[in-house]
């Protein structure tokens, strides 16, 4: 055998991964690689790069779950090669999907379905769910306008400070977005300003049940009642879609007396993230319609399933079934009792943080993490006229040096001069972990007090997560 080939073969067989030739070069990033390498070497390169990511458990900006038990990992692994869209090939996964739809519909007080199956679908997240809910709103509105012989070329959607997905929906589906702007003292959509924005071209009103900027609920019932009066005065009937990305899996367990869901007759659809407070792994969302009449059949495609056909309505197509199966595991594992305990624990942490942080500076709280107020988030600003010697951007930057990702950012609309800090409390961020955050918070305040010349340098480098 050629000596070079023998040497190469011996190296490939015996070299440790850190002695391998492939790891002594910079990983390809611009061109498709020419040559193969050992699997352990490729894994090591990627694994080492991922150490540069932030620690997900210390990410207090995200609404998404960052902790999953070992059974979720096992189920995800079992389902990695099952295509969610292939109902005929994977009938049991499809059956589990339908069970979840029924469970979520029951949680949100949807009317009992005529055929025993609730109307809804799993999505890749709440953004896709919002898109689907918005499409159905536009189609229903267009039908009504056509039946009345009126033009359908100027649809609009009325909402408060919404997540970016609604801006995408408006642009992609050619709908005017009438977003009620945040302003000092009026950070959320109120009935008066909502009604002023509505007309016969309004396809629907979208309250956000858990506003991303602050964590507060935009309560649907007062808006719903105002729309009732608007219809009585004008004859214009306007539907509601509830964007419950976070609140949809919180209020049913910890604040069941809040009337926000299908108990309100105008609510035709609700969307939520399974991978936020639904406790599923990333890549899971849900949208549920009130009944079959609320989902225009032109939007539904039929696919083969158990010798018959089943309707499907989605923007995405091929994707693994693992997220749905993991969501079903959480539903079975926890039930109403378990979800109530898990979510209450997050609220207790939020309340503790709000109480302790209030002692540390001149802060005005927008959200204190109470179940009757919003999601388990703590959001605050510096009191007007107060100068503690640092900005919230400075504080965010100092906390980041200890691994904590706590965003400081300006509000939107007409409130862009208001800088807030927001802390999300989720499963896995337990009381002991919160105490460690407080210790680093206090240490950061001391550092900023001892180094006043460094104030303000972090402003351009801070980040937001809304």
From Swiss-Prot:
GO CC, alphabetical: cytosol; membrane
One record GO biological process: glutamate catabolic process
Any one Pfam family match given in the protein's UniProt record, by short name: Pyridoxal_deC
Binding sites annotated in the UniProt record for pyridoxal 5'-phosphate: 126-127, 212, 275
Keywords: Decarboxylase, Lyase, Pyridoxal phosphate
Binding site for substrate: 62, 83
Transmembrane parts of this sequence: none
Cofactor(s), by name: pyridoxal 5'-phosphate
Keyword Lyase: yes
Keyword Amino-acid biosynthesis among record annotations: no
Molecular function via GO: glutamate decarboxylase activity; pyridoxal phosphate binding
Coiled coil: none
UniProt catalytic activity: L-glutamate + H(+) = 4-aminobutanoate + CO2
Top-level EC class: lyase
Recorded superkingdom: Bacteria
CDD domains according to UniProt: DOPA_deC_like
Induction: By acidic conditions. Expression is regulated by a complex system involving RpoS, cAMP, CRP, EvgAS, H-NS, GadE, GadW and GadX. The level of involvement for each regulator varies depending upon the growth phase and the medium.
Protein EC: 4.1.1.15
Modification N6-(pyridoxal phosphate)lysine occurs at: 276
PANTHER family: GLUTAMATE DECARBOXYLASE
Subunit comment: Homohexamer.
Function: Converts glutamate to gamma-aminobutyrate (GABA), consuming one intracellular proton in the reaction. The gad system helps to maintain a near-neutral intracellular pH when cells are exposed to extremely acidic conditions. The ability to survive transit through the acidic conditions of the stomach is essential for successful colonization of the mammalian host by commensal and pathogenic bacteria.
Family: Belongs to the group II decarboxylase family.
Protein name, entry field: Glutamate decarboxylase alpha
Species, as recorded: Escherichia coli (strain K12)
Underlying gene: gadA
């Amino acid at each position: 055998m050629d000596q070079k080939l023998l040497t190469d073969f011996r190296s490939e067989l015996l070299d440790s991964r850190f002695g391998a030739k492939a790891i002594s070069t910079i990983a390809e990033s611009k061109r498709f690689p020419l040559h193969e390498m050992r699997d352990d070497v490729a894994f090591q390169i990627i694994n080492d790069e991922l150490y540069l990511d932030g620690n997900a458990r210390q990410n207090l900006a995200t609404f998404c779950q960052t902790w999953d038990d070992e059974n979720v990992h096992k189920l995800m692994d079992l389902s990695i090669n099952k295509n969610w869209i292939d109902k005929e090939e994977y009938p049991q996964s499809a059956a589990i999907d339908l069970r979840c739809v029924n469970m979520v519909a029951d949680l949100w007080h949807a009317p009992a379905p005529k055929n025993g199956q609730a109307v809804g679908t799993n999505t890749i997240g709440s953004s896709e769910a919002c898109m689907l809910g918005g499409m159905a709103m536009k189609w229903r509105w267009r039908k009504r306008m056509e039946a009345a012989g009126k033009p359908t070329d100027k649809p609009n959607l009325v909402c408060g400070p919404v997540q970016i997905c609604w801006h995408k929906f408006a642009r992609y589906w050619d709908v005017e977005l009438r977003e009620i702007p945040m302003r000092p003292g009026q950070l959320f959509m109120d009935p008066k300003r909502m009604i002023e924005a509505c007309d016969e071209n309004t396809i629907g009103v979208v309250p956000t049940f858990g506003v991303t900027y602050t964590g507060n609920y935009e309560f649907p019932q007062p808006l719903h009642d105002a729309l009732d009066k608007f219809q009585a005065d004008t004859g214009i009937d306007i539907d509601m879609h509830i964007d419950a990305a976070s609140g949809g899996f919180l209020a049913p367990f910890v604040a069941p007396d809040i009337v926000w869901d299908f108990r309100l007759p105008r609510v035709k659809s609700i969307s939520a993230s399974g991978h936020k407070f639904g406790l599923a792994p990333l890549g899971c969302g849900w949208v549920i319609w009130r009944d079959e009449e609320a989902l225009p059949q032109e939007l539904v495609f039929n696919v083969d399933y158990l010798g018959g056909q089943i309707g499907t309505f989605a923007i995405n197509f091929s994707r693994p079934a693992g997220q749905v199966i993991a969501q079903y595991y959480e539903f079975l594992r926890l039930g109403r009792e378990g979800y109530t305990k898990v979510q209450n624990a997050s609220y207790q942490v939020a309340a503790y943080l709000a109480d302790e942080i209030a002692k540390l500076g001149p802060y005005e709280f927008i959200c204190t993490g109470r179940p009757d107020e919003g999601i388990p988030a703590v959001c605050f600003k510096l009191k007007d006229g107060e100068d503690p010697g640092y900005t919230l951007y400075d504080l965010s930057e100092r906390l980041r040096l200890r691994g904590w990702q706590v965003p400081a950012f300006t509000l939107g609309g007409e409130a862009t001069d208001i800088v807030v800090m927001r802390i999300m409390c989720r499963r896995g961020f337990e009381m002991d972990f919160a105490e460690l955050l407080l210790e680093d918070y206090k240490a950061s305040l001391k550092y900023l007090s001892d180094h006043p010349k460094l104030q303000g340098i972090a402003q351009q480098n801070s980040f937001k997560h809304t």
